[in-house]
Design a protein with these regions (language model features):
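Secretory targeting and sorting signals
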Residues: 1-17
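Post-signal peptide N-terminal regions of Sec-secreted extracellular proteins
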Residues: 16-144
């Protein structure tokens, strides 16, 4: 996922001064296992029948680039519309920003990720993320 760093994040939550995130479609390629970055993700939550989402914090392989992401897996045979929101926090409680991805019809039978902007932080500062999708709370990711 290192190639994705620098893109904006996707999230779905309270209306704050959130930046726009960036949707990236992966088809049937799992975005976590296909990445050289470290992903810390909360458990999957059901948005609708055959549609799951989870919030993640990501740290680049170089240990300095961090970002928030919301992964959506659409197992339906038709497109499904989703909007997301996520915040990225440091282990000392600092909010590094909020991102939202506008409603988009996500392709059938595939993975799509909303990424927030890459934030450069020292590798000694851990980050985690909270988020939502279509108003469903996705919980809190582990620290990475």
């Amino acid at each position: 996922m290192t190639a994705v760093f620098g893109l904006s994040l996707a999230t779905a939550g309270p209306a704050a001064a959130a930046e726009s995130g960036t949707w990236v479609a992966y088809g049937n390629t799992n975005p976590i296992t296909s990445s050289s970055s470290t992903w810390g993700c909360a458990g999957s939550q059901t948005l609708a029948t055959d549609v799951l989402a989870q919030v993640c914090a990501i740290r680049a392989a170089n240990n300095t680039g961090t970002q928030s992401a919301v992964i959506v897996r659409n197992n339906r045979s038709t497109a499904y519309s989703v909007h997301t929101y996520a915040d990225l926090f440091t282990s000392n409680g600092g909010n590094q920003g909020a991102w939202q991805c506008a409603t988009k019809a996500l392709a059938a039978n595939g993975w799509t990720v909303c990424f927030g902007r890459t934030i450069t932080l020292s590798k000694v500062i851990s980050v985690n993320s909270v988020g939502s999708a279509n108003g469903v709370r996705l919980g809190t990711s582990p620290y990475v």
